A protein has these predicted regions:
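P-loop NTP-binding core
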Residues: 1-286
């Protein structure tokens, strides 16, 4: 993870690390990972903003706002302001969750906004403009991307420092990685040259079976020499699948379960990466 600093007089201000949690395939545990990694980082004492960048509003619903269409301000509202050069007030549209993270919610209006982005000048960078005012208020900003490679996902990749890719431990999910990696490379070349791949996270794993071990070995063998594959994997669990309906994170719903422990370890692994990058960035800023 990359942490950038800027000087304000004699004070160095830290900018949030922005992570796009993305996979164009649905059902990979993307929303679950965004929510629980964010709350795991908050449990480590970090200030975290989650951004629901999916018109389905899955992250919004999963975090307990069961009627996203009734929310007065969502990501669509803020991106429309950016498109029309209207000011966005500090904290506008931000919801506060009981588990210590903030959320910019989404609903179906975001689908209509994605269509209008096509005719917008600087269309790939509207989300980046929305986040401009928040990036010095948080340690981490996590973007839950839509399961497609459309304009909203491109906006997320254009705004991000890194992308984290959850991949379900199945053969077809592993095969779909190549298309996403090509999109990341294209965004890096044309829009955001600083974009890095945070890593591939294996989700819904079951290494008790030969098949599960084969998929793990397949992905690590195919990509591990070029891209980080997180040591920590997220095991399959019925309890984890129940959290969305409960409107709670895995830490609140099943705090002693294996999935909670896995996300806790993932947060520590991610934080260790951030600490290393922070040290390097501080040395370069001197």
């Amino acid at each position: 993870m990359r942490v950038v600093h800027r000087r304000r007089g004699d004070v160095i201000a830290k900018k949030a690390t922005i992570i796009a949690v993305t996979n164009q395939k649905g059902g990979t545990g993307k929303t679950t990972t965004c929510e629980n990694l964010g709350i795991g980082l908050a449990m480590e004492g970090k200030k975290v903003l989650l951004v629901d960048a999916d018109p389905q509003g899955s992250l919004t619903i999963s975090m307990g706002w069961q009627q996203p269409d009734e929310l007065p301000t969502t990501l669509s509202t803020l991106m429309a302001k950016a498109m029309n050069d209207q000011p966005i007030q500090p904290g506008e549209g931000v919801l506060h969750h009981a588990e210590g993270v903030d959320l910019i919610p989404a609903n179906i209006e975001l689908a209509g906004l994605e269509v209008s982005l096509v005719n917008c000048m600087n269309r790939e960078k509207m989300l980046k403009q929305v986040l401009e005012g928040a990036k010095y208020d948080y340690d981490f900003i996590l973007l839950d991307c839509t399961p497609s490679l459309g304009m909203l996902t491109v906006n997320a990749l254009a705004a991000a420092d890194t992308t984290l890719i959850p991949v379900q431990a199945q053969y077809l999910s592993a095969k779909g990685l190549e298309q996403l990696l090509q999109t990341v490379q294209k965004v890096r070349r044309q829009i955001n040259p600083k974009l890095k791949i945070e890593g591939i996270l294996l989700t819904m794993t079951d290494n008790r079976t030969n098949y599960g071990q084969q998929i793990d070995n397949l992905i690590r063998g195919a990509y591990g020499s070029k891209i980080k594959v997180f040591d920590q994997t997220i095991p399959r669990s019925v309890r984890a699948a129940e959290t969305s309906a409960a409107g709670k994170s895995i830490f609140a719903y099943d705090p002693k379960g294996k999935v909670a422990e896995a996300y806790k370890s993932l947060a520590k692994e991610a934080q260790a990466d951030a600490d290393r990058q922070r040290k390097l960035s501080s040395e370069r800023a001197r």
